[in-house]
Amino acid sequence: MLGGRIVAAWLKAQGVDKVFALSGEHILPVFDGCVEEGIEVIATRHEQGAVLAAEAYARVTGRPGIAFVTAGPGVTNAVTGLAVANTSGSPVFLMSGRTSTKKRLTGTFQDIDGRAITEPVTKWADTVFDVERIPTYLETAWRRMVGGRPGAVFLELPHDVLKGDAEVSVAPLRFAEPPGASPGALATALKMLGEAERPMVIAGGGAFWSGAADELRAFAERTMIPVATLNAARGLLPDGHDVCIGPMAEAGLALIQSDVMLILGTKFDASVTFGGPPLFTGNEKIIQVDIEPTSFGLNRMPELALTGDVRVVLTQLTDGWDAKPKDEWCRTAKESGQQMHAAWEATTVGEGSPVPPGVVCGAVVREAGRDAILISDGGDSHTWAITTFPAFRQGSYLATHDSLGTIGVGVPYALGAKAAAPDRTVVLCIGDGSFGFGALELETAARNNLPFTAVIMNNGSWGNIRHEQGRQFSQTNATELSVGDYEKIAEAFGGYGERVDDAANVGPAIRRAIDSGK
């Protein structure tokens, strides 16, 4: 079996049926293998788009996303996508071609050390030099990708290795049962939560990647401890559930009243204000659960750290709970969340021109429907979206949540989300600046019959940065953009395009775009 076929056959054995890629000579043997193994290759227009689409695919399906690029600039163009996935804790496997081993370091075409470039932004990076060892390297990469806190991995595949021939076997990987918390730590956690008057749960990305949706619901319904969700865990407990307060934007009033917080699968980074104000007072006691011990102590040390898989630990906590449910506090917390929700929802009503940004977000929510996958990207546009976009099921709201503050992810995310869930409506709300990064992936969507609706907030500027520039300095510059007719880009590839300049027309226009099926 040729090396390219080995790669494809091994991936097929792990259940992979779609990959994202940008072609080049050094990686072509893998594409041939994908054809033979029945793996769909969704070819993008930029390598960053391929990796980001793979991450979105992972965040919708809960399974690793796979991407391929060629050697040299193929690798360098993919680095930001890797950094986003790794910082976000998303399992993404990028493989690239490489110059044949005999031509390394000769100044030949597209020869660059992909391993050295990608190591700083991945959990693991390496190069395979022997066709017979391809399965071993693939297995190592996969285990590193999904083991502990998930992340991005990279494997470099020299051209002569991919064209080599070997007799190998492939099979699905088997994994050990994930660990739970120690009995002593578990008992302490149950005591702290049971004695608390105003406990809260914050569920982060680790809860999603552990597959803890059922376990989170069971724990919440038994204990009646209110839950807020963030990042990849949005929708893990649906917004609107009796025990779910929703996103952090609506949970703030309850959080600052809490005396004990159970933090599930998230670090104290910017997404939770580093464990300090305005979401935390410093007086609450923290119980932090994470599969990755190095997550403990970042910016704030918890009173109790439980090392274990979130899904397993939640089952342990539910089984061990013997305190009274926190019904009264849950009602109070829920009411505070509803107050915040009403305040944010009030911003979605407006009229006239220019169109208020809240009106755009509100129209997206109403027209997309409860089963849609919503995506936001940009500065100002994303800020409005995170306060108004709901999540009624896991994987239904995607936005960049890495500490890099990366913009330009939206169009590739929409592409990957639609590939992951072809039967669901996908709507992207994006700023005009961010749209420019991935605009040509509209051609990818059209070519692969992956329709989604992109709603562009077009203010002719890098708005968020321009606001800050104007606040700090006496003049603004380098933050202006043309107020382009971006709808014509969609039309150029056979899609539906419409320009809207009045608030009253936003909802109907979004409806027409969705109904067009383009």
Sequence positions of predicted segments:
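Glycine-rich, anion-gripping cofactor-binding loops and their flanking helix/strand elements
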Residues: 59, 205-287, 392-424, 437-440, ...
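A short, small-residue-rich loop immediately preceding and capping a beta-strand
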Residues: 17-20, 40-42, 60-99, 202-205, ...
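Thiamine diphosphate
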Residues: 95, 104-105, 109-110, 255-258, ...
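Active-site diphosphate/adenylate-binding microenvironment
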Residues: 7, 22-35, 336-423
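Phosphate/pyrophosphate-binding active-site segments
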Residues: 132, 168, 191, 283-378, ...
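Glycine-rich, acidic loop regions that bind phosphate or pyrophosphate groups
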Residues: 96-137, 159, 231-335, 510, ...
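Conformationally flexible catalytic loops at phosphate/diphosphate-handling active centers
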Residues: 140, 144-195, 344-345
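Glycine-rich phosphate/diphosphate-binding loops that line cofactor/substrate pockets in enzymes
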Residues: 5-17, 56-62, 86, 144-148, ...
